[in-house]
Amino acid sequence: IGYLIGYLIVANLLLPIYYNLGLTSIYEYLYDRFGKKSHLVGSISFLISRVLGASFRLYLVAIVLQEFVLDDFGIPYEITVIISILLIWLYTRRGGIKTIVWTDTIQTTLMILAVVLSIHYINKDIGWTFAEFVTSSEFQEFNKIFVTDSIMERSYFLKSIIGGAFITICMTGLDQDMMQKNLTCKNIKEAKKNMIVFSFILTAVTFLFIVLGALLYIYSNQNGINIPLVDNSPRTDLLFPEIALRSGLGGFLGITFILGLIAAAYSSADSALTSLTTSVCVDILKIDSNKSSSKRTRKYVHVLMSA
């Protein structure tokens, strides 16, 4: 609910501002509204946060691929990372944002398909239909949506709704990585439509991930699968690959997991790379896109951001 409220605010408040000003980078608004220093601080803050965030996500995915798949083939971790970044750089170098839109669509479809198939195969192994799963006593332990016991509770429902709305406004409406695709729509009407449709799709996908998370815990409890340990600390993020690749559910589930994992990693990294290049060129270097020398500079920036 909080996410939906946040996306409606972004669609009806922030998007019109960006379109009326004809912005390429959303941080140009800071220059018009607050001046050069605020513009520079905003764009540099985005640069640092996005480099760290995208790098960390790609690092996590590379670790999972290395530990559960590529180690068996004797492929070094360094080679895995280099090949991943090189592939992302190659297809964003030529196509730009248009390529990102299409590849993100394909990658997101693969990721959602992986989640749906994972839910199906784990349910099938347990012996449940989906209807039996959502009505089971085991699932009831994980499906409490509205916590109303005490306002002091960390997950009290009003805190979750308000927090979700502000998270969406900050992480979507004020983030070049998330907004760049909306800024390529033909007009503000199309951009609003895209944002609102996306918000409802995201709600459905979030529900699927909640279902998958509950199902993973139920399956691991029933089959005596422990949460993997790293440096003697439990790593719940490794439970999914542990079940998908090592629990004996079949090779198809493992392949589905790997495809979904790669799709998620590439979708995040390629979008971040394009938005970083845009922000550096537009906000920091003030490059004129019509000059031939600027094209060379953009290529150098693209390579630097990849590194």
Region spans (language model):
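Helix-loop junctions at the membrane interface of multi-pass solute transporters
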Residues: 13-20, 27-32, 46, 89-93, ...
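Loop-to-helix junctions at membrane interfaces in multi-pass transport proteins
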Residues: 1, 31, 76-77, 109-255
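Helix-loop-helix module between adjacent transmembrane segments
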Residues: 2-93, 163-171, 263-270
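Loop-to-transmembrane helix boundary motifs in multi-pass membrane proteins
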Residues: 36-40, 79-82, 278-307
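Residue-level recognition of pore/gate-forming positions within transmembrane alpha-helices
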Residues: 3-7, 47-50, 85-89, 107-111, ...
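Hydrophobic alpha-helical transmembrane segments
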Residues: 40-41, 78-83, 158-162, 253-256, ...
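Membrane-embedded translocation segments of transport machinery
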Residues: 233-266, 270, 287-300
